[in-house]
Amino acid sequence: MAEGAEHQQKLTEKDKAELPLSIRDLAEALGIPVIDCLIPCNFCGNFLNYLEACEFDYKRLSLIWKDYCVFACCRVCCGATATYEFNQFYEQTVLGRDIELASGLSIFDIDIRCQTCLAFLDIIEKLDCCGRGLPFHKVRNAWKGICRQCKHFYHDW
């Protein structure tokens, strides 16, 4: 077993830059369909199913590379991670368009993820939050809002 550990290749920064960051890009690099990709969750170890693999890419999350082993994050662990980060690293809350004052950027230029599922908010979702005066939270030096799917959990339709 020690012999195997000695022969494991370590990733250099150059190697990391060349590895795929999305499941779709990984499947393309391997020449297989996305449905055939079996990628374990970094947190729970379960393999992502096809829907979770598609959601992972839709959320614009990045694959995690440990040496030459790849990991992703399943739906349940995305929610758990979002909750943990919010509870541990919360910084501030602003309402609606005040996010522009707090960040010094236009709403069009601010990267915002969902506070519940970690999806990357598109411009329609960001403008919807601004128009409704919904809160944006700064967590771990990044902005969080609410995506169109998760807002239904809050009965905000």
UniProtKB/Swiss-Prot annotation:
InterPro entries tied to this protein: E6, E6_sf
Subcellular locations according to the entry: Host cytoplasm; Host nucleus
A GO cellular component annotation in the UniProt record: host cell nucleus
Keyword terms, alphabetized: Activator, DNA-binding, Early protein, Host cytoplasm, Host nucleus, Host-virus interaction, Inhibition of host innate immune response by virus, Metal-binding, Modulation of host cell apoptosis by virus, Transcription, Transcription regulation, Viral immunoevasion, Zinc, Zinc-finger
Zn finger residue spans: unnamed: 41-77, 114-150
GO biological process: DNA-templated transcription; regulation of DNA-templated transcription; symbiont-mediated perturbation of host apoptosis; symbiont-mediated perturbation of host ubiquitin-like protein modification; symbiont-mediated suppression of host innate immune response; symbiont-mediated suppression of host type I interferon-mediated signaling pathway
Primary location class: host cell
GO terms of molecular function: DNA binding; zinc ion binding
Family label: Belongs to the papillomaviridae E6 protein family.
Subunit structure: Forms homodimers. Interacts with ubiquitin-protein ligase UBE3A/E6-AP; this interaction stimulates UBE3A ubiquitin activity. Interacts with host BAK1.
Functional note: Plays a major role in the induction and maintenance of cellular transformation. E6 associates with host UBE3A/E6-AP ubiquitin-protein ligase and modulates its activity. Protects host keratinocytes from apoptosis by mediating the degradation of host BAK1. May also inhibit host immune response.
UniProt name for this protein: Protein E6
Organism: Human papillomavirus 5
Organism taxonomic ancestry: Viruses, Monodnaviria, Shotokuvirae, Cossaviricota, Papovaviricetes
Gene that produces this protein: E6
